[in-house]
């Protein structure tokens, strides 16, 4: 009897111990195999932080320059007249943190993380779908990336921040209503870790965010780089601007223009202007006041090549057509300062200082205003003064855009203007102009390599031309002939496809030479056609 009793007791103990052992085993198996809510939100938050702070922050900083905000109604009259004008006014106020690049990135990331977390709460999905709410911030970022230049060029710059705050408010309201209507149980509020391969919400949101990060890098590199170059231009970081241009896989006109501005300030324009590839991509812009990409760079290019009045005029046109933008107000103030128009400059400074955080800019301008020596001694403005026109002619006398048309057509100027005029002729592939200006240039300095290469190309149809130029080495002549020999069989196909095939075959070994630019560069004229009155 005792044996049967002991047997039954052992069986009971075994049955009791089995679930405990299973439970213990289950708890132990969660280590490294299960993902909790904190891990989900940490991973997605880091991805958003990476995009907002590291990748997209230059665009946010430039958005601050495309913005204008004042607490007073009169300076904001243009905005207030628009439909939902007061909403746009609030949106422009909410953009103010973008004034600091890293603060703006953190601000954007915080809004997106909170929105995603609140959307998750509103959806109240099962544990394996935790994090699915972050698909909404990913979709908003995908829209911002897809818009590209249209996010701010001739469009209301506050749309992005308004959409962000709208998403946050809607998510908060939805989460609040969900919390009121449904009482949380202990099971729902528990951590509820799930196996990593079952974390569908995390996987979907991660894939969506990685797609946005990768797509922005692949298709919107020029937007980010041009914004970064404009930001660096405000700090006179010419070397940083050049580095940005060299990093571009296929620079657009904006990147090329700011690259030239930086090289000009470094005094290296003719030495390095053809270091980048001038195979311009087609930029798709909204047809708002025109589809010309030039609105992004013409005013600054005119100003920094010494055409101060032309830069002022272009900025004023955009100011009138598109409403107040800090970027154009600052340029008009600087142009007025350089032209010693003190009252006009003070007028623009009056508007600028109504915007928060712009006191330092106004103070710096006022310290120079009316002091010709101080302006000449300041590196950036002193350099601009060296390029001021010596000919008294109207803008209409030259092809557009002025910073190219003037330098192609100018007949007299300073030694510095001679450099820019040669560069403009090289860019325009105007051989007669190149030959004429190079004759003057060789009297001032040793001919740069790109000029020597251009003259050798010109000599193919002008025997004896090189006799007029000293210092063109046999090495340069042989190099150009070598290029022509390699390119000749590739140039037989005159179709667009054939030209692109030729460019691809030569770009690796010959990019950076004038031969490559002359035969393979700046051929895509779909976005900005070259005519008798325009320079592409």
Tell what function each PLM region has.
Residues 220-388, 392, 409-430:
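Soluble catalytic regions of membrane-associated enzymes that act on cell-envelope
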Residues 195-220:
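Internal/C-terminal transmembrane anchor helices
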Residues 28-44, 127-129:
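N-terminal membrane topogenic signal
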Residues 48-53, 136-148, 208-214:
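Aromatic-anchored segments of alpha-helical transmembrane domains
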Residues 55-64, 143-156:
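Juxtamembrane "helix-exit" motif on the non-cytosolic side of transmembrane helices
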Residues 109-127, 141-145, 171-175:
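Transmembrane-helix motifs of polytopic, lipid-linked glycan transferases
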Residues 37-41, 77, 101-110, 157-171, ...:
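Alpha-helical transmembrane segments of polytopic membrane proteins
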Residues 53-94, 98, 102-103:
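Membrane-interface coil-to-helix junctions
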